[in-house]
């Protein structure tokens, strides 16, 4: 992973620019990391994510019942979880010597997940994916003449 720092123009918020899944500091999947930001509205987080310009930006807070609370934002809104941004968060915390090797818990919209920092890597826990069995929602919606979102809201 590699790490750079950028300043958000608004509110002088420090954003770490981190590439996860790199080899020899090349390539990877970029994410923004904001550590202990001031109280921000959803709109402000979206604006920062837009300014960062990566697929996700993580906002990291001290947790009440976990080690950390992490919010993930895209340029369009909040998402439940982001794997490469999670790795970016813990790489940043470790690089800044704020964390030692060990197990840490993070609260996300996807639930409470464990992240393990080792001397040479970071491993994260993810919830099992939800798989849907049955006909394609888009096909059913088209046949019924309704929007797919109507069916998706039912969780069927």
Spell out what each predicted region is.
Residues 3-81, 87-156:
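Active-site proximal loop and beta-alpha junction motif in alpha/beta enzyme cores
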């Amino acid at each position: 992973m590699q790490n750079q720092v950028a300043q958000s123009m608004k509110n002088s918020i420090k954003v770490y620019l981190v590439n996860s899944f790199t080899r020899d500091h090349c390539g990877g999947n970029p994410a923004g990391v904001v550590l202990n930001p001031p109280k921000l509205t959803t709109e402000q987080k979206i604006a920062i994510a837009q300014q960062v310009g990566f697929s996700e930006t993580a906002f990291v807070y001290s947790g009440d019942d976990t080690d950390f609370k992490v919010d993930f934002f895209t340029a369009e809104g909040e998402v439940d979880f982001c794997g490469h941004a999670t790795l970016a968060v813990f790489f940043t915390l470790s690089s800044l010597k704020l964390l030692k090797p060990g197990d840490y818990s993070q609260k996300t919209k996807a639930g409470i997940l464990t992240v393990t920092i080792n001397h040479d890597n970071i491993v994260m826990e993810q919830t099992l994916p939800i798989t849907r069995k049955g006909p394609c929602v888009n096909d059913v919606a088209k046949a019924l003449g309704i929007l797919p979102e109507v069916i998706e809201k039912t969780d069927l």
